[in-house]
Amino acid sequence: MAVVDDLAPGMDSSPPSEDYGRQPPQDLAAEQSVLGGMLLSKDAIADVLERLRPGDFYRPAHQNVYDAILDLYGRGEPADAVTVAAELDRRGLLRRIGGAPYLHTLISTVPTAANAGYYASIVAEKALLRRLVEAGTRVVQYGYAGAEGADVAEVVDRAQAEIYDVADRRLSEDFVALEDLLQPTMDEIDAIASSGGLARGVATGFTELDEVTNGLHPGQMVIVAARPGVGKSTLGLDFMRSCSIRHRMASVIFSLEMSKSEIVMRLLSAEAKIKLSDMRSGRMSDDDWTRLARRMSEISEAPLFIDDSPNLTMMEIRAKARRLRQKANLKLIVVDYLQLMTSGKKYESRQVEVSEFSRHLKLLAKELEVPVVAISQLNRGPEQRTDKKPMLADLRESGCLTASTRILRADTGAEVAFGELMRSGERPMVWSLDERLRMVARPMINVFPSGRKEVFRLRLASGREVEATGSHPFMKFEGWTPLAQLKVGDRIAAPRRVPEPIDTQRMPESELISLARMIGDGSCLKNQPIRYEPVDEANLAAVTVSAAHSDGAAIRDDYLAARVPSLRPARQRLPRGRCTPIAAWLAGLGLFTKRSHEKCVPEAVFRAPNDQVALFLRHLWSAGGSVRWDPTNGQGRVYYGSTSRRLIDDVAQLLLRVGIFSWITHAPKLGGHDSWRLHIHGAKDQVRFLRHVGVHGAEAVAAQEMLRQLKGPVRNPNLDSAPKKVWAQVRNRLSAKQMMDIQLHEPTMWKHSPSRSRPHRAEARIEDRAIHELARGDAYWDTVVEITSIGDQHVFDGTVSGTHNFVANGISLHNSLEQDADVVILLHRPDAFDRDDPRGGEADFILAKHRNGPTKTVTVAHQLHLSRFANMAR
């Protein structure tokens, strides 16, 4: 193949003549004149400081000089060549700017200090152009990022934000010192006091509501929520009428529900006090027409904007709001309503998508420094109550859990019940699955009651159980799915391993061993000797050594009925009524007086690092577990038994710390306590247990034999498998890459759930993020085997920041979606549910959340026939 030059005659093949390496826009002479004028005249400083910031100067030396001048001027000290040189020297910057002689150079170059303000305008223009160049460079980078797979909508939005920041001259820092914030805050407090308690915000038009909230403040997100037909859109328009018609401040409504004509008709009905039904039907009287014409002329100049574009996305709302902020000094945004918004993206659930809208609206409020009112629809919770009053929990989309549900903490490694979190008010770090299906620590920022609802018990093939309402989402391969939509045979996520807690605390090994022995095979009842029943002499020796930590000794009593050793003080007798050190130690751990079916693992063990967790499990297994090889079936048997379900769950949780997933079986017993067994299945997990945990005492020999047998070919049940639907994704990707080789094209293979090794092999051949996460993530895909209603119970939920999920009872569950709102107003109208209600004509604004003040219920009059709410007579 030949390479030829196909340029036309006369065309030069040299690079373009434009110099792409030229300096950014700047005017050093103007910068020097500005600084020279400021050094000569205090009046010049006053003219310049409102126009320039240190970052507007191109030369870093000029930035330092300008900053020093402003600092001296702010302290009331003179700012001349001598004092500025001293200030720069104190900061260690004098040599960097060229020494004291350079300050005199600045003074000598200024034509006249009287024109310093004009010179500052030149510097500001050049700074604006530089920022435009910088923004353009970043936009180009965003464009290339979009070509390489970044989300296009996000790229466009970031590009718009860059240009908006340039036009708005907002070069904000990521952090601001407290001293720079104190005076503006004092000014705001003074303004509030001088205006009779009303902040410089947007008045809602409702006297009592404004008294509580001090108006709608810049940067706030306000949610107005109600059931359909109660009047939430009307209230949003009332806020806009107060803002734009009464106070002549610009407002905009992005309406996804009503058309422009419907909105204008409602506004005219409210302002002219004409029945909306008469306007719609054309039955207006002459007086109505007169009032309408008069009011139209009065409100026609109101800076009120309406956008009824269908299928509005968050990106479009941001772009339009930014333009209005520049064009009309926008003061209020209303979005009607939240659940009708679309994103154009694929989210794991609608709940997460709505939560993202909420978060972006809050960010928009902060960016534009205006209040954003988001209209939202409540779930059916109010209709199920006798008084029909809405609660904050009705605003959330997720389901609820019972008080006994245990949440896995990331700070201590232990579990804590929802009910306990409600009582204590604690908000701990919890383990959560991120988008890569990896366990990460995230804060649980809220825990709250959700009333009394029907609860279902969901049981998995592994024996794990959780009690939740039908609306609570569980994680399937396809995404988060409410319990009511799950069916037997579905696969949902549970953690296959859990990291060490954030705050690990080592225990003395002697205490750890004694604790494991006492939990596994000990007795510590009140008014009885503390006993331990060893399986063999090696285990008795371990207890004898470890008991010394609490000044105790394992002593075999001589009388026949004793049969087992007692743990008691080794040296002295205690006065009557005093606990032994061993009993006091067990009581401090919450184990003293616990019977076998009440035992559990203390929090101190969960706090221990993983090597100590393995040591604890080794001695616990020696006391109450079994490890053996089954030659008949050609597989290993590893299990632990107890009459305490809580203890079994705790052991299962500890096994996750060493990367082992276990299975729980139930053995009912008539006339006694049921028993439970925890099994470790599969050669891979059994080998891991034997190598990283092991057993102590006589069973150690059996464990070595079992490990030897597991090195050969053994029966291995395919328990650790991925959902069968993953094959569709694998096949599509392999087919697209023409990689359907013999290893992954066996006809029978596609009919069954793949073991984790197969997606792992596929992931090595195809570049698919979902397959990668499935093959390497921390999610175990357990199978639903039973869903049973257990009646109505009081339920609770929580909110986890960022990832929006947590581990409860060993299962990954979605959380409630915390609203990002600063203010939540729940609208309640008694006669909406009962026309004969004695409070007919009244409505309640329930201020359910108020980040900067108290909550309260404000009663107003509803005049929905006039499309408005009104203040009640006081």
From Swiss-Prot:
Catalytic activity: Couples ATP hydrolysis with the unwinding of duplex DNA at the replication fork by translocating in the 5'-3' direction. This creates two antiparallel DNA single strands (ssDNA). The leading ssDNA polymer is the template for DNA polymerase III holoenzyme which synthesizes a continuous strand; ATP + H2O = ADP + phosphate + H(+)
Location of region: Disordered: 1-25
PTM per Swiss-Prot/TrEMBL: This protein undergoes a protein self splicing that involves a post-translational excision of the intervening region (intein) followed by peptide ligation.
Residue ranges of domain DOD-type homing endonuclease in the record: 582-660
Protein keywords: ATP-binding, Autocatalytic cleavage, DNA replication, DNA-binding, Endonuclease, Helicase, Hydrolase, Intron homing, Isomerase, Nuclease, Nucleotide-binding, Primosome, Protein splicing, Repeat
Domain SF4 helicase positions: 195-462, 612-874
A biological process from GO: intein-mediated protein splicing
Pfam families (alphabetical): DnaB (PF00772), DnaB_C (PF03796), Intein_splicing (PF14890), LAGLIDADG_3 (PF14528)
Binding site for ATP: 226-233
SUPFAM superfamilies with a match to the protein in the record: Hedgehog/intein (Hint) domain, Homing endonucleases, N-terminal domain of DnaB helicase, P-loop containing nucleoside triphosphate hydrolases
GO MF term set: ATP binding; ATP hydrolysis activity; DNA binding; DNA helicase activity; endonuclease activity
Cellular component aspect of the GO annotation: cytosol; primosome complex
Protein EC: 5.6.2.3, 3.1.-.-
NCBIfam families listed in its UniProt record: DnaB, intein_Cterm, intein_Nterm, PRK07773.1
Subunit field text: Homohexamer.
Family per similarity comment: Belongs to the helicase family. DnaB subfamily.
Function, in words: The main replicative DNA helicase, it participates in initiation and elongation during chromosome replication. Travels ahead of the DNA replisome, separating dsDNA into templates for DNA synthesis. A processive ATP-dependent 5'-3' DNA helicase it has DNA-dependent ATPase activity. The intein is an endonuclease.
PANTHER family on file: REPLICATIVE DNA HELICASE (PTHR30153:SF2), REPLICATIVE DNA HELICASE DNAB (PTHR30153)
Protein name per Swiss-Prot or TrEMBL: Replicative DNA helicase DnaB
